[in-house]
Protein backbone atom coordinates (compact mmCIF):
# COMPACT_ATOMS: atom_id res chain seq x y z
CA UNK A 1 0.00 0.00 0.00
CA UNK A 2 1.23 3.46 -0.89
CA UNK A 3 0.60 6.56 1.19
CA UNK A 4 -3.01 7.75 1.36
CA UNK A 5 -3.10 11.54 1.83
CA UNK A 6 -6.78 11.58 2.80
CA UNK A 7 -6.26 9.01 5.55
CA UNK A 8 -3.10 10.69 6.82
CA UNK A 9 -4.66 14.16 6.94
CA UNK A 10 -7.70 12.77 8.78
CA UNK A 11 -5.33 11.57 11.54
CA UNK A 12 -3.57 14.91 11.96
CA UNK A 13 -4.54 17.23 14.83
CA UNK A 14 -4.79 20.26 12.53
CA UNK A 15 -7.50 22.59 13.85
CA UNK A 16 -10.07 24.52 11.86
CA UNK A 17 -8.64 27.97 11.14
CA UNK A 18 -5.02 26.81 10.94
CA UNK A 19 -2.49 28.17 8.46
CA UNK A 20 -0.75 25.39 6.52
CA UNK A 21 2.13 25.45 4.03
CA UNK A 22 2.23 22.56 1.57
CA UNK A 23 5.86 22.64 0.42
CA UNK A 24 6.40 21.12 -3.00
CA UNK A 25 2.65 21.04 -3.57
CA UNK A 26 2.83 19.41 -7.00
CA UNK A 27 -0.68 19.08 -8.45
CA UNK A 28 -2.28 20.09 -5.14
CA UNK A 29 -3.60 16.76 -3.87
CA UNK A 30 -2.54 17.47 -0.29
CA UNK A 31 -3.44 21.18 -0.54
CA UNK A 32 -7.07 20.49 -1.46
CA UNK A 33 -7.52 17.93 1.32
CA UNK A 34 -5.90 20.31 3.81
CA UNK A 35 -8.20 23.13 2.66
CA UNK A 36 -11.19 21.05 3.73
CA UNK A 37 -9.52 20.20 7.05
CA UNK A 38 -8.82 23.84 8.03
CA UNK A 39 -12.17 25.12 6.78
CA UNK A 40 -13.03 28.57 5.46
CA UNK A 41 -11.34 30.22 8.45
CA UNK A 42 -8.03 28.55 7.59
CA UNK A 43 -5.53 29.04 4.80
CA UNK A 44 -3.37 26.66 2.78
CA UNK A 45 -0.34 27.95 0.93
CA UNK A 46 0.51 25.66 -1.98
CA UNK A 47 4.23 26.35 -2.47
CA UNK A 48 5.69 25.05 -5.71
CA UNK A 49 8.58 25.93 -8.03
CA UNK A 50 6.88 24.70 -11.22
CA UNK A 51 4.59 27.44 -12.48
CA UNK A 52 2.50 25.06 -14.59
CA UNK A 53 1.62 23.14 -11.42
CA UNK A 54 0.52 26.37 -9.74
CA UNK A 55 -1.78 27.18 -12.67
CA UNK A 56 -3.21 23.68 -12.45
CA UNK A 57 -3.85 24.10 -8.70
CA UNK A 58 -5.53 27.49 -9.27
CA UNK A 59 -7.77 26.08 -12.01
CA UNK A 60 -8.74 23.04 -9.94
CA UNK A 61 -9.42 25.15 -6.84
CA UNK A 62 -11.69 27.38 -8.90
CA UNK A 63 -13.50 24.38 -10.42
CA UNK A 64 -13.98 22.82 -6.96
CA UNK A 65 -15.08 26.10 -5.36
CA UNK A 66 -12.14 26.08 -2.94
CA UNK A 67 -11.20 29.62 -1.93
CA UNK A 68 -8.76 29.04 0.93
CA UNK A 69 -5.82 27.74 -1.13
CA UNK A 70 -3.28 30.33 -2.21
CA UNK A 71 -0.56 29.35 -4.65
CA UNK A 72 2.95 30.65 -4.04
CA UNK A 73 5.73 30.36 -6.59
CA UNK A 74 8.56 29.22 -4.35
CA UNK A 75 12.05 27.84 -4.22
CA UNK A 76 11.61 26.03 -0.92
CA UNK A 77 15.35 25.45 -0.53
CA UNK A 78 16.23 29.15 -0.25
CA UNK A 79 15.99 31.64 2.61
CA UNK A 80 12.72 33.55 2.08
CA UNK A 81 12.07 31.20 -0.83
CA UNK A 82 8.49 30.52 0.23
CA UNK A 83 7.77 34.26 0.48
CA UNK A 84 5.74 33.52 3.63
CA UNK A 85 6.08 35.67 6.74
CA UNK A 86 8.32 34.65 9.63
CA UNK A 87 6.56 32.45 12.21
CA UNK A 88 3.23 32.59 10.34
CA UNK A 89 2.48 28.90 9.74
CA UNK A 90 0.84 26.42 12.14
CA UNK A 91 1.61 23.31 10.06
CA UNK A 92 4.14 22.60 7.32
CA UNK A 93 3.50 19.59 5.09
CA UNK A 94 6.45 17.92 3.34
CA UNK A 95 4.93 15.05 1.37
CA UNK A 96 7.08 13.05 -1.06
CA UNK A 97 9.45 15.99 -1.36
CA UNK A 98 12.39 15.41 0.96
CA UNK A 99 14.09 12.95 -1.38
CA UNK A 100 14.07 15.63 -4.12
CA UNK A 101 15.57 18.44 -2.05
CA UNK A 102 19.16 19.24 -2.97
CA UNK A 103 19.92 21.88 -0.31
CA UNK A 104 18.45 20.19 2.74
CA UNK A 105 20.05 22.65 5.16
CA UNK A 106 18.47 25.61 3.36
CA UNK A 107 15.18 23.76 3.19
CA UNK A 108 14.91 23.01 6.91
CA UNK A 109 16.05 26.56 7.78
CA UNK A 110 13.22 27.93 5.64
CA UNK A 111 10.77 25.65 7.45
CA UNK A 112 12.08 26.87 10.80
CA UNK A 113 11.68 30.49 9.68
CA UNK A 114 8.01 30.21 8.65
CA UNK A 115 6.86 27.87 11.45
CA UNK A 116 5.15 29.38 14.49
CA UNK A 117 6.79 28.61 17.87
CA UNK A 118 3.97 26.14 18.56
CA UNK A 119 4.02 24.80 15.00
CA UNK A 120 4.30 21.28 13.63
CA UNK A 121 5.79 19.68 10.53
CA UNK A 122 4.52 16.52 8.86
CA UNK A 123 7.08 14.65 6.77
CA UNK A 124 5.87 11.80 4.57
CA UNK A 125 8.49 10.29 2.33
CA UNK A 126 9.67 7.08 0.73
CA UNK A 127 11.21 4.53 3.06
CA UNK A 128 12.69 2.61 0.12
CA UNK A 129 13.10 2.80 -3.63
CA UNK A 130 10.50 0.03 -4.09
CA UNK A 131 11.64 -1.40 -7.39
CA UNK A 132 12.31 2.02 -8.88
CA UNK A 133 8.67 3.11 -8.51
CA UNK A 134 9.92 5.56 -5.92
CA UNK A 135 13.11 7.60 -5.89
CA UNK A 136 16.47 6.12 -6.80
CA UNK A 137 17.91 4.26 -3.80
CA UNK A 138 20.68 6.86 -3.37
CA UNK A 139 18.06 9.64 -3.02
CA UNK A 140 15.93 7.97 -0.35
CA UNK A 141 16.08 9.90 2.94
CA UNK A 142 15.68 7.40 5.78
CA UNK A 143 13.39 8.31 8.67
CA UNK A 144 16.35 8.33 11.07
CA UNK A 145 18.18 10.81 8.81
CA UNK A 146 15.09 13.03 8.63
CA UNK A 147 14.95 13.03 12.44
CA UNK A 148 18.59 14.16 12.60
CA UNK A 149 18.01 16.90 10.01
CA UNK A 150 15.05 18.37 11.83
CA UNK A 151 16.77 18.06 15.21
CA UNK A 152 19.44 20.44 13.84
CA UNK A 153 16.86 23.24 13.83
CA UNK A 154 15.37 22.34 17.20
CA UNK A 155 12.43 20.26 16.04
CA UNK A 156 11.73 17.02 17.82
CA UNK A 157 9.72 13.97 16.84
CA UNK A 158 6.23 14.06 18.30
CA UNK A 159 4.87 10.92 19.99
CA UNK A 160 2.20 10.43 17.33
CA UNK A 161 2.21 7.39 15.05
CA UNK A 162 1.44 8.15 11.40
CA UNK A 163 0.65 5.16 9.20
CA UNK A 164 1.96 6.33 5.85
CA UNK A 165 1.76 3.01 4.02
CA UNK A 166 4.20 0.17 3.54
CA UNK A 167 6.69 2.06 1.37
CA UNK A 168 6.59 5.42 3.15
CA UNK A 169 7.16 6.78 6.63
CA UNK A 170 5.32 9.59 8.35
CA UNK A 171 6.77 11.70 11.15
CA UNK A 172 5.42 14.75 12.94
CA UNK A 173 8.00 17.19 14.25
CA UNK A 174 7.26 19.99 16.69
CA UNK A 175 9.15 23.09 17.72
CA UNK A 176 7.98 22.60 21.30
CA UNK A 177 6.33 19.56 22.85
Task: Give names to the regions the model predicted.
Residues 81-91:
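A short acidic, Gly/Pro-enriched loop at the edge of an enzyme's catalytic core
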Residues 105-120:
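A short glycine-rich, Lys/Arg-flanked "PGG" loop and its adjoining helix->strand segment in the class I
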Residues 1-18:
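Conserved alpha-helix/loop element of class I SAM-dependent methyltransferases that forms part
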Residues 89-103:
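A short SAM/SAH-binding and catalytic strip from SAM-dependent methyltransferases
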Residues 38-39, 101-102, 115-117:
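Helix-to-beta-strand junctions that scaffold the AdoMet/dcAdoMet cofactor pocket
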Residues 122-149:
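Conserved class I S-adenosyl-L-methionine
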Residues 159-177:
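Core SAM-dependent methyltransferase catalytic element
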Residues 21, 27-80:
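Class I SAM-dependent methyltransferase SAM/SAH-binding core
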Amino acid sequence: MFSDPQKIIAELPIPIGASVADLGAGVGTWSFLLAKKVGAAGKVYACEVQKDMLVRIENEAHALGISNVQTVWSNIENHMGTKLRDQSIDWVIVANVLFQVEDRTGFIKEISRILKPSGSVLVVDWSESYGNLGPHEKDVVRASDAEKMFAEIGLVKAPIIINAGSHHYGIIFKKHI
